[in-house]
Design a protein with these regions (language model features):
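Functional cores of ribonucleases/endoribonucleases
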Residues: 26, 33-136
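Low-complexity, glycine/serine/proline-rich disordered segments
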Residues: 1-31, 35
Length: 136
């Protein structure tokens, strides 16, 4: 797919629309955020998932996802040129700086984001969306 008609402002609009559609019922919020420290700790202990504090309490997950998207060197190329409908981004959460008991001994270190996209029959990108995002 060759989609050279999109300009940088249009790419930002796609990103903003994608992040704007994340809400309390979204998979990323509903399944990967925690209301209490004990809930986070329970998931850590029972599922052996070293959960990052960025998905805890009042942390703005939308802002984290947008930051991951904007800092990804592959995002623009994927939007403009790739036939692949899935993009995986894994990045450090060095900006987090928070620590909760639920972490156990695990540092808040990394986040895994999977994006999807819909393409019109004419080959132009219709929208991008978050398939999932979780701490690793």
């Amino acid at each position: 797919m060759e989609n050279k008609k999109l300009k940088m402002g249009e790419i930002e609009a796609l990103i903003n629309s994608c992040v704007g559609k994340i809400n309390r019922k979204s998979h990323v919020i509903k399944n990967h955020s925690f209301k209490t420290d004990s809930e986070l700790k329970k998931r850590y202990e029972t599922k052996k998932i070293p959960a990052a504090s960025c998905f805890y309490k009042n942390i703005n997950i939308k802002r984290i996802i947008k930051k991951l998207m904007l800092e990804s060197p592959e995002l623009t190329s994927w939007i403009l040129h790739s036939d692949t409908k899935r993009l995986e981004i894994q990045d450090d959460l060095h900006h987090c700086g928070r620590k909760y008991d639920g972490h156990g001994y695990v540092e808040c270190n990394s986040c895994y984001l999977v994006l999807g996209k819909e393409i019109n029959p004419d080959g132009h990108i219709k929208k991008i969306y978050v398939r999932t995002c979780y701490p690793v």
